[in-house]
Each structure stands twice: as structure tokens, then as C-alpha cells.
Amino acid sequence: HEKQYQKNILSVIRQAQYDNEGHELDLLLCLNGLPVATAELKEKSKDQTYKDAIKQYKEDRDSRNTLLRFKRGALVHFAIDAHEVHMTTKLQDSETDFIPFNKGRDGGFGNPDNPDGYRTAYLWEQIWQKEIWLDIIGKFIFHLSEQQSPPLPPKEAIIFPRYHQLESVRDLTANTKQVGTGTNYLIEHSTGSGKSKSIA
């Protein structure tokens, strides 16, 4: 399996044109040529933040486009500035919901200071690195389908782990490999932050 694993090719396309009208995404991340993630980058020097990236996804990105379509195109979409990262797995134009993909700061929102660069550098310095990125794609992302009362169709979602979920599961896995099974753990997240999915 190691040889097959090493054959995986991760690539990043900057200013990726995704339609015949010349519209571009700041970043397109691919695995073996298949689109996995998109990203819009904003910088404070131009008076723009991740909120402008979210607005761009909602207002200027056609969710019917194959690359952006739910269950057909990229699995996750990131809105990024120097301080925060937000994400969604389902673009629905103005109805799109973005959630934070931040590390947390002093027990609250945002990201801690980074003496070596941007507060959001963990995204490309850690998360998008080959080992972790392939781990996320192979073991963490899943399709959720919940039945609703007829005639409503099933409620569907692609679940992409938030940063704290990813960190807690990877820490627990590493600890279990070191000390073995049989240990009890307490997972502490704030209300509505995905404890049940972390435990699962």
C-alpha cells in the first residue's frame, strides 16, 4: 500500500479558470488531477477579509457549475485571510453557510498569534501537507444522508472536519497507538461544535 500511497499527486492551481466566461478561483487543490478543494484569498492591505471571500462565493460563484456543484465538484471551499479561515462543503449561492476552520484563540474565536507569519499559516503549513491532507480525504470526510418525512427528500451533507475535531481525533489516535486500548477519554468542545462526530 505504501507504493500506491506515494503515487498520489497533490497539486495546486493558482487563478484557476472554471468556466467559459473567464471566472477564476484563487486556488484549486487537486488530488491526482481531481478537484478536492477551492479557496478564495483576501488580504487586509486591500481592505478585504474572509467575509469578502464568503460574499464572493455567495454572489459571484455559480453553484451549478460542475466544479462547484455539491457532490459533483470540489469537496470543500475555503474563505481565507491572514487571521481567519472559514469553510463550507455545500455552495448554495446566497443560502450558503460557512463555518470556522480556526484553531481558537484564548478559549474563544479566531487564531493565536504566529510570530513566524500569518495566523492562518497552519492551513498550508500543516493541513494541506500531503500526509494530513490525504488522511483527511481518506478517513475524515464522509457523506451524511438523513431521512425526512415524505415527501421531503433526504437531507444531505458532506462532513469535513473542523480544526478542533481533526486535532482531537488525531491526538487520540496517536495516544492510543502509544499506550494501547482501554483508556477512557473526555472530548470537550463547545455546544454545537461537533462532539458527537468527533467521537464517532
Feature roles, as predicted:
Residues 1-200:
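ATP-dependent helicase/translocase motor core
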